[in-house]
């Protein structure tokens, strides 16, 4: 039996070249279309009618010429202590996120949910990081037209923690709540697989923004969150700012900490103190 090592070598080289070409193609595609991977919106028709079991007001907030963000404001069940500005996660739209309103309205707060660009009934889509920061500030500016700043709480969940942390760093709300926060967007995506940092067009450095946050900071994170690892992200934030951040690890919880009794009880106590 004669083995043609040259022929085998050529085949292996062709296979390796094809593999590298596919990897390169995947990286180029990811770089060009990364917004479509990182943002996973549910698009709603402009004439979509929301239905919830509690009162709400639908609002369109202008953030740029010809760009409005659709938002829902749910009033408190009793005398309102203020408003929670809620920046949601990377999937779905307000018809789903609004189902969480009762968690906050039961605790004497109005809550404003806002859909990002490309989500729900909001216009446009994101093409650069600066648009994220612009929108976070414009939404906060809108809230200031209806509430005193000392009555505003900012809450961010998952991808929304970047929006929330930025807004808190540029303003003076009375409290910042972060649920399943990431250290930075670069770190989060790099942790998900063999994706080089230079390929990621968005940094969203939450750890930097937190340096300029002057209000109290409360972090909630599930101990079994396999999407945003609590040790790689919120623990590092706590270690970086040990005196600024109060971190609560929700035992046994995954990414959606709001589904647990521990979260609800701790949130109730927190909001009662504010």
Positions of predicted regions on the chain:
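An N-terminal hydrophobic leader/cap segment in hydrolases
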Residues: 16-62
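Membrane-embedded segments
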Residues: 64-142
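Short alpha-helix in the alpha/beta-hydrolase fold that links the catalytic acid
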Residues: 100, 206, 215, 229-239
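Alpha/beta-hydrolase fold nucleophile elbow
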Residues: 148-158
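Hydrolase active-site cap/lid region
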Residues: 161-215
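Short beta-strand/loop motif that positions the catalytic acidic residue
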Residues: 213, 219-225
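Acidic catalytic loop of the alpha/beta-hydrolase fold
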Residues: 224-228, 256-257
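Catalytic histidine-centered segment of alpha/beta-hydrolase-like enzymes
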Residues: 253-262
